[in-house]
Amino acid sequence: MATGFASTGDLAEKKVTFSEIGPDLYAFTAEGDPNSAVIVGDDGCIVFDAQATPAMANKVIERVKAVTDKPIKYVVLSHYHAVRVLGASAYHAQGIVASQETHRLIVERGQQDWDSEYGRFPRLFQDAQSIPGLTWPTLTSR
């Protein structure tokens, strides 16, 4: 007998923290949720992992604006999972950076992963209508 994922019943809000973990290095975390990291550079910021939706990404953006007025120039995607990348459009970044392998996996299974994670993590996708589509890297590396 198959059972559903425990995460489908996880609808309670999580406590979010935004902590400086090093000079100009911040961690956006919530228990059990995807994390984002932020580096504040000389003329802009880099965000690592975008969050599941633009609405969730806006929570990261609010925290970044509380510590700097520098623009978010780049979003780096660590891998292709929907809960980490579909919020990228909210940043209006100069570039979306990912490995060539991440790009390949988005092509191969991005929509399938989105559909799967949407069903498994309803709390993370409460604002799914804000997602304009799959996230495509504009800069790739090996």
Please provide the spans of the model-predicted regions.
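Short solvent-exposed loop/turn micro-motifs enriched in small/polar/acidic residues
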Residues: 10-12, 30-32, 132-133, 138-140
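Hydrophobic small-molecule pocket/channel-lining residues, especially in calycin-type beta-barrels
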Residues: 4-5, 29
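Active-site HxH/HxHxD metal-binding segment of metal-dependent hydrolases
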Residues: 62-141
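Conserved beta-strand hairpin/beta-sheet module of binuclear metal-dependent hydrolase folds
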Residues: 18-63
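Short acidic, Pro/Gly- and aromatic-enriched capping/linker segments at domain boundaries
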Residues: 5-20
